[in-house]
Amino acid sequence: DVYKRQEVKENMPAFDEIMNLSDFFKVMGDSTRLQLLLSLQQSEMCVSDLANVLDMTKSAVSHQLKALRLSKLIKSRKEGKTVYYSLDDEHIETILGMAFDHTKEH
């Protein structure tokens, strides 16, 4: 019906917001980055620890962490010479949990 279509159209987010959401899912759509996020969901970790857990080089881990940091999915803090990474906020943890639950159900 015409009113329903108009209501849907009026409630559609702005194009910029849709593009931001699309970029978010592109970053989340990489299996290596998902492994990093799932690791960081359990514990704050440094590059060496993440490389060990995922059996990757430190360079490869650093490259993926940069993408996650630029997308504001993770944050970092420095302690001495070591940089520790963690999820940026509880929204990321919730999204990961909901997505994981959804895939287990289907």
Task: Give residue spans per PLM region.
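Short, small-residue-biased leader/transition segments that mark boundaries at the very start
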Residues: 2-3
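N-terminal helix-turn-helix DNA-binding core of bacterial DNA-binding proteins
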Residues: 13-59, 83-90
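Conserved segment of winged-helix/HTH DNA-binding domains
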Residues: 20-21, 86-106
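Short, hydrophobic-biased segments on the C-terminal half of alpha helices
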Residues: 65-66
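Beta-hairpin "wing" of winged helix-turn-helix
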Residues: 69-79
